[in-house]
């Protein structure tokens, strides 16, 4: 059923061709209208004052003023849900991670003939993300400071020791900025491994893992097929691969594979969480954080049935209360906590689990 009031979107891109593609995609949905366009950051700032759009799609690389600088100004003066439009390149990935830290809600891949994603799938993703962004509570719309890296966090790569306990974390929309807060607070001596699924395309997960590694006392890396899961390390599922944990020669080992998408995504958290529950049993903590959809809910059930401990982010601090809500509705969540308590709750849960 169409909304009573259309979602008004401003499209910002220096390419007239790209603005046309995005306009056509957005206006193919009856609930969305493109209220205005801008060719660069300066024009975007001028138009956001007068047009007051509900959502902005913002290119990163533009002349005069780039997307990051425009984002910082908009979030500080005219807080509006912003979705970054990012090239699927390493530079694009790194800039996008910065944008999410500064306050962008989400990002979409820039449509092009070279990207390996069909147009219908891309259309559905863009429209879904714009609709979710339009619902984001105003309290989340603000310029955030990027974390300054402490010299004390320069850490030696720990010698590998196979983990006997594990924390399985699922996150999607709003996840990157929220996970940074969690990882910043976790101790370096966790005596457990972390397995993390954050819905992101290839390349972006590597940049995100590197960013987490820089702000965390734990060692964080993008997972590789066949590597042993070690304690005090965190493994981020790479974009476009499902990640599971299996036992190989008695050691927990990463398995990556390109199976069918689950809940429309790859990587998906459910197969990862179920596999962690199988390998680690009651020595598992499951965590579901902000994101749209219901990925992670089945994983929470699997972990609880094996005797593990389960945690979900609360509604008030979730940028999108979809995945945590689905997890909570299973009736299998032990602790529903705000974002700033997730790290402490993980540590507390691990204290209850045998080493």
UniProtKB/Swiss-Prot annotation:
Its main location: cytoplasm. Keywords: Chemotaxis, Cytoplasm, Hydrolase, Phosphoprotein. It is found in: Cytoplasm. GO terms for molecular function: phosphorelay response regulator activity; protein-glutamate methylesterase activity; protein-glutamine glutaminase activity. CDD domains: CheB_Rec, REC_CheB-like. Phosphorylated by CheA. Phosphorylation of the N-terminal regulatory domain activates the methylesterase activity. The modification 4-aspartylphosphate is found at residue 59. GO terms for cellular component: cytoplasm. InterPro entries: CheB-like, CheB_C, CheY-like_superfamily, Sig_transdc_resp-reg_Me-estase, Sig_transdc_resp-reg_receiver. It comes from the Archaea. The keyword Cytoplasm applies. Its EC number is 3.1.1.61, 3.5.1.44. The active site is at 172, 199, 295. It catalyses: [protein]-L-glutamate 5-O-methyl ester + H2O = L-glutamyl-[protein] + methanol + H(+); L-glutaminyl-[protein] + H2O = L-glutamyl-[protein] + NH4(+). The keyword Isomerase does not apply. Residues 8-125 form the Response regulatory domain. GO terms for biological process: chemotaxis. Residues 160-353 form the CheB-type methylesterase domain. HAMAP family: CheB_chemtxs (MF_00099). NCBIfam families: PRK00742.1, PRK12555.1. PANTHER family: PROTEIN-GLUTAMATE METHYLESTERASE/PROTEIN-GLUTAMINE GLUTAMINASE, PROTEIN-GLUTAMATE METHYLESTERASE_PROTEIN-GLUTAMINE GLUTAMINASE. Involved in chemotaxis. Part of a chemotaxis signal transduction system that modulates chemotaxis in response to various stimuli. Catalyzes the demethylation of specific methylglutamate residues introduced into the chemoreceptors (methyl-accepting chemotaxis proteins or MCP) by CheR. Also mediates the irreversible deamidation of specific glutamine residues to glutamic acid. Contains a C-terminal catalytic domain, and an N-terminal region which modulates catalytic activity. Belongs to the CheB family. This is Protein-glutamate methylesterase/protein-glutamine glutaminase.
């Amino acid at each position: 059923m169409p909304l009573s009031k259309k979602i008004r979107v401003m499209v910002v891109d220096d390419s007239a061709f790209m603005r046309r593609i995005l306009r056509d995609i957005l206006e193919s949905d009856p609930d969305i209208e493109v209220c205005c366009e801008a060719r660069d950051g300066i024009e975007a700032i001028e138009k956001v004052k007068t047009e007051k759009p509900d959502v902005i799609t913002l290119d990163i690389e533009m002349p005069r003023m780039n997307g990051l600088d425009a984002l910082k100004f908009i979030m500080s003066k005219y807080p509006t849900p912003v979705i970054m439009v990012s090239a699927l390149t390493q530079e694009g990935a790194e800039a996008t991670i910065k944008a999410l830290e500064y306050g962008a809600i989400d990002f979409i891949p820039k449509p092009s003939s070279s990207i390996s994603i069909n147009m219908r799938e891309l259309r559905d993703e863009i429209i879904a993300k714009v609709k979710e962004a339009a619902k984001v509570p105003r309290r989340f719309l603000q310029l955030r400071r990027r974390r300054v890296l402490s010299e004390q966090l320069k850490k030696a790569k720990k010698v590998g020791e196979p983990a006997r306990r594990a924390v399985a974390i699922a996150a999607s929309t709003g996840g990157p900025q929220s996970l940074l807060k969690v990882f910043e607070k976790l101790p370096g001596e966790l005596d457990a491994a972390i397995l993390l699924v954050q819905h992101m395309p290839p390349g972006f997960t590597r940049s995100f893992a590197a960013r987490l590694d820089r702000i965390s006392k734990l060692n964080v890396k993008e997972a590789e097929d066949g590597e042993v899961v070690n304690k005090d390390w965190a493994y981020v599922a790479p974009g476009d691969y499902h990640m599971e944990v299996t036992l190989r020669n008695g050691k927990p080992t990463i398995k990556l594979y390109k199976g069918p998408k689950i809940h429309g995504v790859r990587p998906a958290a459910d197969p990862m969480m179920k596999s962690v529950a199988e390998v680690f049993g009651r020595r598992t903590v499951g965590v579901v954080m902000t994101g749209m959809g219901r990925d992670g809910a089945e994983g929470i059930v699997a972990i609880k049935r094996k005797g593990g401990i389960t945690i979900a982010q609360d509604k008030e601090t979730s940028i999108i209360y979809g995945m945590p809500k689905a997890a909570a509705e299973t009736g299998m969540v032990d602790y529903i906590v705000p974002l700033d308590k997730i790290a402490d709750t993980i540590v507390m849960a691990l204290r209850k689990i045998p080493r």
